[in-house]
Amino acid sequence: PAEMQQTDALVRLKENAEQKMKTDIGQPFIDIAQPNADGEQVSLESVVRNPANKYVLLDFWASWCGPCMGEVPHLKKTYDEFRKKGFEIYGVSFDEDRGDWLGAVEQNDMNWLHVSEVKGFDNQAAKDYAIQGIPSNFLIDGQGTIVAKNLRGEALYEKISELLAQ
């Protein structure tokens, strides 16, 4: 019946809204772990808690996503400039094909950490972070707090530059 469908939709909407609140600025990050290119599970926590990393960008993307690939030059510029100063990227691909995922990483010289369950949007990280569209990202500080969300273009470079100057 229509009432049941509406109820199900409302329940999903409510759950998504509650999950989104858990990933607001000021909230602690939610740990995730996915396989890297070698098939080894890499947890976000291990990257955030690494003393060398002052800020970690949790970046959700896919090779088929035009806007995601449009962000790559900005990510590369920021990573190349600040990785030795404490900036790391934990890239989570929403690709469903391993070859597409790893091919995009290689072709675009995306030389930071990449993980993927190779399940598209049907992956645990998408649920944990209430991801409904990509590109999407979360900037996490060394204490594990989300300090910014969805930094695009020059905004990412400017924010990291500002934070690392403090």
What is each stretch, according to the model?
Residues 1-42:
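Oxidative protein folding and maturation machinery
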Residues 37, 71, 94-99, 103-107:
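Long, His/Glu/Asp-enriched segments that create or flank divalent metal/ion-associated functional microenvironments
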Residues 44-51, 126-129:
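Short amphipathic alpha-helix with an adjacent loop that forms part of the alpha/beta core around
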Residues 52-56, 135:
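Alpha/beta-hydrolase fold active-site loops
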Residues 57-58, 89:
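Hydrophobic beta-strand anchors of alpha/beta hydrolase catalytic cores
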Residues 60-77:
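Conserved redox-active cysteine motifs that mediate thiol-disulfide chemistry
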Residues 85-100, 110-121:
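Thiol-based oxidoreductase modules, predominantly thioredoxin-like and allied folds used
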Residues 110, 117-165:
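Thiol/disulfide oxidoreductase modules built on the thioredoxin-like
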